[in-house]
């Protein structure tokens, strides 16, 4: 039995692979990028391939007893084009998903873990958000994940567990956080959309990996599960905690959402993107997921707080800067 990870060279993928190897499993990473952790190359099999290519996927030679963790995706951390964003996200997140599903079906491979996103919900009606909340994504990334979920559920013989995590953070995560950490490391003011009293929940990468392993342990229930931290702080509390941890002289500057959001929209349209619409639209909103279901059915509960995970991400950012 092999544990196959698509997109295993990414942030979550490498930590998942490391944990699977520690548990004595045979691991295969299917990705177009090499590992950043060189130690993983010696312990696992690497198959170079593009999820958009049916021929590349054939290199995996899928078997009925394989387990597929489908992490390959385009995200906002990548170089998102200024135009045709829907096609750009869909060719990997939707077409790529269809390709791996067809290969699994042909091989009789029936077990999958898929990481979707809470961005499938869009602007929410109430908090905390349960898994049966309507899916009304605000943009192309969330829409691509909704379509990927639909494809997965169309395969009736597939035992696929779908996770919808909040923003995944922890040591090694940058993306949008890199801009924040840079300001703090330089003791510069940190702008904040709104007054910071909203709770912007996150989830640690280690807790996400634990959830994937719990799905495996529980025979891959055909369910959708939210993933998020417990008792998230307010945005102001979170940012102040990181600034304090960094011994930075940075301070927060609240900016009225009604003023800054049109500015961010205009900057995005002319190619000077600071935040993408799907990001800034909810930055001043309460974003809390109900994790009751995953706790009850998988026995999963987060072990890492948002502040701890974000401080670990900041420390990692500083360590990387020191080596450059």
Segments the model singles out, each with a brief description of its role:
Residues 243-285:
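Terminal hydrophobic/aromatic helix or amphipathic segment near a protein terminus
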Residues 3-23:
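N-terminal Rossmann NAD(P)H-binding glycine-rich loop of SDR-like oxidoreductase domains
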